[in-house]
Amino acid sequence: MFNRNLTLDQVDPDVWAAIQKEDVRQEQHIELIASENYASPAVMQAQGTQLTNKYAEGYPGKRYYGGCEYVDVVEQLAIDRLKQIFGAEAANVQPNSGSQANQGVYMAVLKPGDTVLGMSLAEGGHLTHGASVNASGKLYNFVPYGLDADEVLDYAQVERLTKEHKPKLIVAGASAYALHIDFERMARIAHDNGALFMVDIAHYAGLVAGGAYPNPVPHADFVTSTTHKSLRGPRGGVIMMKAEFEKAVNSAIFPGIQGGPLMHVIAAKAVAFKEALSPEFQDYAQQVVKNAKVLADTLVKRGLRIVSGRTESHVMLVDLRPKGITGKEAEAVLGQAHITVNKNAIPNDPEKPFVTSGIRLGTPAMTTRGFKEAEAELTANLIADVLDNPRDEANIAAVRARVNELTARLPVYGN
């Protein structure tokens, strides 16, 4: 039998040591990677329970294994809470990731070779929206759409391509697009031309839940998402759909592309969804956007160019070409200053994907630790200070000291 009193540091000190160092890094650094956030202790506790031991192929009330009466309760709570947050008719909480959620929708309604419209990866889309290196781009005939001359989503192009190519499905959503997406307009284009409409809100889900970004659920046939990022849950995925597609989507997830669901993760999803229904989460989502706008505005005042000129969400792309520094270099020097960002291609980027001409910044994690407008403005100025003198080690050290003071004052996991 197992001894309940044995702790990880006793069983595996090597893994424990690495975890402790990562804990220190997360506490000391300002996290600005737009896809990252901090899960609550309750979410992490749920994910570390005995539910990890339970196989539960199937769905609540219709399992292929016995002993599922309690995990059925957990999964149904997750489903019901997700539907309540977004006003969805039906939901599946079993996808292990956002990519698998997207794959599940594709498998439910498409055949290999079917035509699909998706946002170009080069202009802000996601790998699973038809990138040639991704399974979606290999299995289906994806036609990319992008931005207009003002770096705004080109709805006229979407309509033109829809009429020309007659896709079976149009996919909206992005991994690096700062503005609101007009989901109602996109849905009208799709449905007026006989196409289904899917929205991937992996990046925006927490903002939608908090009323800080438009909700696509009333307009879309399918809405997919991750459960981490701005939603602040465990790493995983979900699908919401019109009731008429529930059976097809459920069959596509299991037995189509997955076997037994990760019940410990679904428990953590249920906890995160309860948190997202709270008034405090509404305030959080609004603050994420406020912080992002201050961050972007301050960077512009410091001479940096923001793609699309502004942000209306949690995320922004910074074009570094006027600074004469690549995204790869900026990521490295900002990391030395304890500011964590990711290099990111800008629209029509001349640099290679591992180099890039830009960085992507996001405010979900900084907001979770209690940053407000004043801290967002300070963070932007610290970023600009580093990028003004990226090879000055004394300058980087001075910024790092100020970052450490700020993060010590506002810890992620306080007492």
From Swiss-Prot:
PANTHER family on file: SERINE HYDROXYMETHYLTRANSFERASE
MF terms in GO: glycine hydroxymethyltransferase activity; pyridoxal phosphate binding
Subunit details: Homodimer.
GO cellular component: cytosol
High-level lineage: Bacteria, Pseudomonadati, Pseudomonadota, Betaproteobacteria, Burkholderiales
Metabolic or biological pathway: One-carbon metabolism; tetrahydrofolate interconversion; Amino-acid biosynthesis; glycine biosynthesis; glycine from L-serine: step 1/1
Ligand binding ((6S)-5,6,7,8-tetrahydrofolate): L121, G125, H126, L127
Organism: Bordetella pertussis (strain Tohama I / ATCC BAA-589 / NCTC 13251)
Residue numbers bearing the N6-(pyridoxal phosphate)lysine modification: K229
Site entry: Plays an important role in substrate specificity: H228
UniProt xrefs under Pfam families: SHMT (PF00464)
Catalyses which reaction(s): (6R)-5,10-methylene-5,6,7,8-tetrahydrofolate + glycine + H2O = (6S)-5,6,7,8-tetrahydrofolate + L-serine
Chief localisation class: cytoplasm
Protein name: Serine hydroxymethyltransferase
